[in-house]
Amino acid sequence: MNFSESFKLSGLLCRFSPDGKYLASCVQYRLVIRDVTTLQILQLYTCLDQIQHIEWSADSLFILCAMYRRGLVQVWSLEQPEWHCKIDEGSAGLVASCWSPDGRHILNTTEFHLRITVWSLCTKSVSYIKYPKACQQGLTFTRDGRYLALAERRDCRDYVSIFVCSDWQLLRHFDTDTQDLTGIEWAPNGCVLAAWDTCLEYKVLLYSLDGRLLSAYCAYEWSLGIKSVAWSPSSQFLAIGSYDGKVRLLNHVTWKMITEFGHPATINNPKTVVYKEAEKSPLLGLGHLSFPPPRAMAGALSTSESKYEIASGPVSLQTLKPVADRANPRMGVGMLAFSSDSYFLASRNDNVPNAVWIWDIQKLKLFVVLEHMSPVRSFQWDPQQPRLAICTGGSKVYLWSPAGCVSVQVPGEGDFPVLGLCWHLSGDSLALLSKDHFCLCFLETKERVGTAYEQRDGMPRT
């Protein structure tokens, strides 16, 4: 495993292009485009204000920069650096901006969610979509880019509208039996739309493309309900994370629950492997010390290293007692993610914040638990294989695969708190994001990890 040098960064704004050739990063009002293989700067663009959001077009030919405070979006072209587009929403304001799947239209959501404006880069035409709902996840495209589903609120009722992305014509419009619709998401195959209600009302609704209600699911009543939702890449499973600390798995045939995964504070099953992060001190002989120390060694000396150890059961995990009289209590399953092959599901229970639970979806049982010394901030699966990257806000990155897990210190002068991460399309590298800097972590090839993956039913190794 190797690391690049660190580069300046603002607002954790660092994104790989969809084709994997470029890396975009922001420094205040400047947009920097680098070649992924050499990390040499290819283009440097200057925006009119500090950038708050960036997004690549699906074909990697354009990139948009949103400046919400100014109500501005600027679009840059990689093929024609002298060309650029400026979209000014004026007094309507701007709270969100995204590409359409064709990479030639931009959807801007105005302040107070009064409307969505669809701007065409080719024809310069403008279309308007009324009544978008201000909710957690109110806009979703099918993977093939043909349809847009939009959550709406009008006349004190929730609705969903489905638009054809080729001409933005309304295809279907139907109301949802929800008190306060919180989110919608298409299944990866684009055949089913999941819609879920506010946390005060446990309800998941599943609709077909033509707006027919396929199924409604409610696990319990009179308590805080849904906190997170995730589709498996195969579209066979819908995972629902709840405030009661459980993940419920619905199947795609009957849309009934096939199992539920609990997140207890104590692991009693002796067959469950629990890795605990533990500190280790670097052993440096006097004969090997140099002054001044090399850059990589200086970073290692400034921060203690750590390793994973297999804990013997029963294992008690660190827990938080949620504050019951405040909104958004730190409890329940707040993070869910399936591996790219749909074999594994990773989850975090927010009142056991230091632990990541990894479930074997084929066998519908707990596979491993990873407990860290600090609360888990983020985790993300390798796009090509079952390998999970985790960060906790410290100067380490953690990697797990079915063959085992490792804690890696990020080298460098001073501290490098890893606040976020994102995988390259190939899975060969990983961008580690800090408050003011980012660097790339280069990993071993898929073939070597794949060999270890074939042994996944055996005892994991550290």
From Swiss-Prot:
It comes from Mus musculus (Mouse). The modification Phosphoserine is found at S281. WD repeats lie at residues 46-86, 89-129, 176-210, 221-260, 328-369, 371-410. InterPro entries: Centrosome-WD_assoc (IPR052778), Quino_amine_DH_bsu (IPR011044), WD40/YVTN_repeat-like_dom_sf (IPR015943), WD40_rpt (IPR001680). Pfam families: WD40. GO terms for cellular component: centrosome; ciliary basal body; cytoplasm. GO terms for biological process: cell projection organization; mitotic spindle assembly; positive regulation of non-motile cilium assembly. It is found in: Cytoplasm; Cytoplasm, Cytoskeleton, Microtubule organizing center, Centrosome. It comes from the Eukaryota. The keyword Phosphoprotein applies. Ubiquitous. This is WD repeat-containing protein WRAP73. Keywords: Cilium biogenesis/degradation, Cytoplasm, Cytoskeleton, Phosphoprotein, Repeat, WD repeat. The SSX2IP:WRAP73 complex is proposed to act as regulator of spindle anchoring at the mitotic centrosome. Required for the centrosomal localization of SSX2IP and normal mitotic bipolar spindle morphology. Required for the targeting of centriole satellite proteins to centrosomes such as of PCM1, SSX2IP, CEP290 and PIBF1/CEP90. Required for ciliogenesis and involved in the removal of the CEP97:CCP110 complex from the mother centriole. The gene is Wrap73. Its main location: cytoplasm. Interacts with SSX2IP.
